[in-house]
Amino acid sequence: MRNKKKFNEFMNKTIEELKDEKRYGTAHVYQSTLNAFCEFCGCKIIYFHQLNRATLKEFETHLRDKQLSWNTVSTYMRTLRGAYNKAVDQKITTGNSRLFNHVYTGVKNDVKRALEVEEINKLLNEVPLKRLPEDLVRCRVWANLMFQLRGMPFVDLAFLHKSDLKGNTLSYRRHKTGGQMIVDIPPTAMELIRQYQNTDCNSPYLFPILSGTKTGEELYIELSLIHISEPTRRS
């Protein structure tokens, strides 16, 4: 007898649980995976019995036909596998240990993502700031600070608090891991900090990247939109 329990309902429940745990990035990946799988299946209701080897292989082919990278395909497949294994553990469906063996779930490192120091210097310094639009000026300032502050991730830069700045040192916790970081600020970076630091006395943030008025999922969405739209936004 086929399992009449709905996989999409289980995925939606998992997404809400992730949001309750404030794991908004993971919840977004689960939602994107569910959307892509529903679009492939041509329906919003998906039963667990539809998760079979043939369907998964066809889904993989469908994603590649849409020009998605192998790493994106792997993300979707690993997300489906994670949800499926969780459902098996909860005895919502019976398990097939080899269900995902024939679809790609690895990570390809065939694309160079790192830049040489000379390339970074060229990007950050070749064109004078005064010749750039205001939105690109801000983007380059943030990139310059991230580079000078020991490769600080953008999310950590955005969440820096005014209280994290102590003289010529930044003392803060990594947003993703919670690990304590202490960074000495080079003179050139300090000059940028003084020039572009937040002037809003009501905001706790060191830089005017986040509004300071949002929390939880709204804050995650705000940061995501800034990360996507900053290079093309016009004042």
For each feature predicted by the language model, list its residue ranges:
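Conserved tyrosine-mediated DNA breakage-rejoining catalytic core shared by Y-recombinases
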Residues: 101, 149, 159-195
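Major-groove DNA-contacting interfaces characterized by cationic-aromatic clusters
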Residues: 108-109, 171, 192-225
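Flexible interdomain linker/hinge and immediately adjacent N-terminus
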Residues: 57-58, 93-128, 211-218
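N-terminal DNA-binding recognition helix of tyrosine site-specific recombinases/integrases
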Residues: 36-39, 49, 65-99, 150-152
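Single conserved hydrophobic/aromatic residue that forms the stacking wall/gate
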Residues: 226-235
